[in-house]
């Protein structure tokens, strides 16, 4: 990824031009999309054109707001002060919530929640939290961020790969707020950044980490299990083979977060209902999804967490098995083995 001084003038300018063009041409684009959907008898073109108009309208609004905040912060000099941090969190909350509402409406997704009272109390109370979630399906990240921002009024610090910074709104907000934007080619730097962000969580801060490192697919699961075997981690490979709906977690990122904030409670989250529609092609083919996104959360108290790193890996796998069992009990997703007749592998982030 090019440095910000090179990247942002290009991406911000391009996004501004595209956003303005999409909004100006939106009546024509929507009319053409409606015609195409009527001719083909398939709604995808109209649905995604509507979604694109919403997306670029929000992108334009956020870029203008980011520019205004930069000027108000004396050219960025006051950007790290509490006032401007709160203003950026409010901007992020508004952007994510509006997009989420339109996204779930257009794709016909219904939301259902299961959660323990302990997890709810921890999220509602003050105190830093670590939030480890399964990663599968389109947009689960934004759904979780919206929940943390809007329902629980938390300030999420998200761990994600730097490739998403190609979106200038994500790029600007992610670097103005304490998110962990990672170059995954440098494992030590990734762990250090996760540890740093976890250590700096405030009273309403929550670190959102996907220990699997990528969306679940049967092929990714096979590859991950093969990689565990090749690296001599046979016990973890054997445990991963007994989990059909999740990728084996990569412990390094989770352990870095625990090192950074050893006193923080951990909330584990799983969700079901979106199946394997994790990539653009699958989403296009299955739209409208007309599904129920069911999520569940559990609190893992500090007192029940081992201090030894090796024991923490076992603890993490124990929880991941619990998430897998919950997904299996929902009955809405086909086990990985059924896709290819095998019980093997899939990858992740640090």
Regions found by a protein language model. Name each.
Residues 12, 139-140, 188-193, 248-252:
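Short, glycine/acidic-rich beta->alpha junctions
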Residues 130-132, 267, 320:
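Conserved beta-strand elements of the Class I
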Residues 46, 185-214:
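Internal hydrophobic scaffold segments of catalytic domains
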Residues 70-98, 105, 125-187:
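Catalytic core of membrane glycerolipid acyltransferases/transacylases, capturing the structured
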Residues 4, 118-120, 137, 146, ...:
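Polar-ligand-bearing catalytic/cofactor-coordination segments
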Residues 154-156, 162-177, 202-310:
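A cross-family acyltransferase "interaction/gating" segment
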Residues 1-129, 143:
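Membrane-anchoring hydrophobic helices of lipid-metabolizing enzymes
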Residues 306-350:
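Accessory terminal regions of nucleic-acid processing enzymes
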